[in-house]
Structures are given as C-alpha cells and as structure tokens.
Amino acid sequence: MVHFTVEEKAVITSLWGKVNVEEAGGEALGRLLVVYPWTQRFFDNFGNLSSASAIMGNPKVKAHGKKVLTSLGEAIKNMDDLKGTFAHLSELHCDRLHVDPENFKLLGNELVIVLAKHFGKEFTPQVQAAWQKMVAGVAIALAHKYH
C-alpha cells in the first residue's frame, strides 16, 4: 500500500482540479500507443492506429483516455485505498483483457509527461514527485490481481 503525506495529497488534488480530463487522458493514452507501439494490440477495435497523427486524432483513443483519467479521479478521491478503488479494474485487466501490468507503469509515466507539458513551471519537482508516487501506486493497485 502506498502512503501519501498530507502535503502530497494536497499537491495531487490541487493540480488535479485544473486537469482537463478529456484532453490529458487522450494525450497520455495516445502517447503510450505511439511511444510503445506493442500496446496497440490491446486496442484493435479502435480503428486507425497506423501513425502518430492517426493515433492522436483517433476519437476512440481520446474517449478511452478520458475514461482512464476519470478512473484516476476516483482514485484521487480515495488515495488511502487505491487497491480497493481499482479492485474491479485489476480483475478485468488481468482475467479478461490479459494486459501486461508493466503497461500501467508506462501509461502513468506518460501521464506525468503530459501534466508537466500542460502545467510548465507549476509542475515543480515536488509536484512531479507526488504525481510519480500517485501513478506508481495506481500501477501497483491495478497489478494487484496478477499476484
């Protein structure tokens, strides 16, 4: 279980309140599919993923990215119970979708990059550290059913 300090929780929730879930979610998932093309195999029903521009403009990528970040928003509300928050999604991704749990870490890292890009100077080293901890905690929670 990941333990967040009061300061880390404040930093995470403060920035989260400014995040455009649709935009950041689509961009983070799109970046994952471009930078790590083997992850595309989990999204064969998304249509054209033949190039970076096709991926970044794909409405299904954007919609799923929004869905992913909406789930992250629930986790931010429940930072003290990430495992419980993601129990169902962990089971789904493990048992039905057979997603390599390493991909959760990769997507988390892409999200941190997107947040840094969007928030610039506001994304200080302290903010980055808190968010890295958050996405790592989420990756652990999502991988829980794999163990």
UniProtKB/Swiss-Prot annotation:
Domain of life of the source: Eukaryota
UniProt keyword Glycosyltransferase present: no
Globin domain span: 3-147
Tissue: Red blood cells.
GO MF annotations, alphabetized: haptoglobin binding; heme binding; hemoglobin alpha binding; metal ion binding; organic acid binding; oxygen binding; oxygen carrier activity; peroxidase activity
GO cellular component: a single term: blood microparticle
Coiled-coil ranges per UniProt: none
GO biological process: hydrogen peroxide catabolic process
Keywords associated with the record: Heme, Iron, Metal-binding, Oxygen transport, Transport
Binding site for heme b: 64, 93
Pfam families documented for this protein: Globin
Keyword Transmembrane set for record: no
Subunit structure, interactors included: Heterotetramer of two alpha chains and two gamma chains in fetal hemoglobin (Hb F).
UniProt xrefs under PANTHER family: HEMOGLOBIN FAMILY MEMBER, HEMOGLOBIN SUBUNIT GAMMA-1
Similarity comment text for this entry: Belongs to the globin family.
Function of the protein: Gamma chains make up the fetal hemoglobin F, in combination with alpha chains.
Protein name in UniProt: Hemoglobin subunit gamma
Organism: Cheirogaleus medius
